[in-house]
Amino acid sequence: MDNERRLVLLTGATGHVGFAVLVEALEAEYNVRVVLREISKADSILSSEPVKNALSSTAAPELSFVEVPDMTVPGAFDSAMQSVTYVVHCASPINRGKFRDFQTELIDPAVKGTTNILKAAHATPSVLRVVITSSNSAIVNHNILPAPGTCVSPSDRQPDYPLDVAMHDADEAYSAAKTSALNATDTFVSSANDLRFDVVSIMPTFVFGPKELAKSPGDIIDGSNVFGIGLVLIKQSWGSLRIEAVSCHIDDVAQAHVQALNHDEDVQFPFKAGTHRSCLLASSFRPDEVRDIVEREFPKESWQGEEAVFRGKGSYAWYHTDYDVSAAEKLLGRKLKGIVEQIRSSGLQVLRIA
């Protein structure tokens, strides 16, 4: 598909996934309008090497910024949506840090932000497709695992979480937020009149790989990387933590979002107004593989001795869920990158900035 320098509205560009999507979109020569809660954050994006490189050619795409302080406010995206052809909505709170109120800080931004994006797109005749960053947590309740032998499909759904469960802790609130946002998308698409665009949801599992805006190893593992390269960076015990050991590479996630903008007849998601389709990105691993990969891929001084960067030797209890990733692999035109490449690229960044 010739993108004809069509304009992409992108949210969440300061996050792990959103920034990678931004770089991928610029390299694919899309013009991008980035939504920021604070316009001052544009400086960190513009000063980053990947963005500077993407904008360095004489025929470089255009990168602009617009401030939307609160995406939960009705009409928040109305003016930002002007002249937009594609929307990529990556912005959503993650379950890290301290929260005073799970409802207002995790769930509302995810659900209201998504519905406000969809409403603004519906009111903008130029919009052809909305791509949304969802999650496997939107379709799998990790407290009630699928029966053995079950393969989870991107078309699967689960009901919204009961309020008492959603408010239990940050992990439950995050899963509740992703579930409700996905279900709200389904409801919007099925009930909207004369919908001129279609919707594609990208559902990553844990996202491992470089965080290009990170300034320190601590920044790199401030997020899902903590369960990957974090295993050899964190020295304390993981305690009784039990984790779904299923992940995907940031490169695959970013490329999936941008490839999903292609709506030609011969691609995975050809244009079909008024529909909502999805794909899952997932690759199973074992936590004990991480140290093996590090010791095989990196110099001995980086993982052995008191001055070594990769001194962590702990692990956590784990389990696997089987996911159908065929739609994602068809979208990308190849197999997904596995744990070796995920840890190798994460480790290279750690060594580069440590």
Swiss-Prot record:
NADP(+) binds at K41, Y174. Its EC number is 1.1.1.-. Pathway: Mycotoxin biosynthesis. InterPro entries: Epimerase_deHydtase (IPR001509), NAD(P)-bd_dom_sf (IPR036291), NAD(P)_dehydrat-like (IPR050425). Transmembrane segments: none annotated. The keyword Oxidoreductase applies. Keywords: Oxidoreductase. It is an enzyme of class 1 (oxidoreductase). The keyword Oxidoreductase applies. It comes from the Eukaryota. GO terms for molecular function: oxidoreductase activity, acting on the CH-OH group of donors, NAD or NADP as acceptor. Gene clusters encoding host-selective toxins (HSTs) are localized on conditionally dispensable chromosomes (CDCs), also called supernumerary chromosomes, where they are present in multiple copies. The CDCs are not essential for saprophytic growth but controls host-selective pathogenicity. PANTHER family: NAD DEPENDENT EPIMERASE/DEHYDRATASE (PTHR10366), STEROL-4-ALPHA-CARBOXYLATE 3-DEHYDROGENASE, DECARBOXYLATING (PTHR10366:SF564). Belongs to the NAD(P)-dependent epimerase/dehydratase family. Dihydroflavonol-4-reductase subfamily. NAD-dependent epimerase/dehydratase; part of the gene cluster that mediates the biosynthesis of the host-selective toxins (HSTs) AAL-toxins, sphinganine-analog mycotoxins responsible for Alternaria stem canker on tomato by the tomato pathotype. ALT1 also selectively transfers methyl groups at the first and the third cycle of chain elongation for AAL toxin. This is NAD-dependent epimerase/dehydratase ALT6.
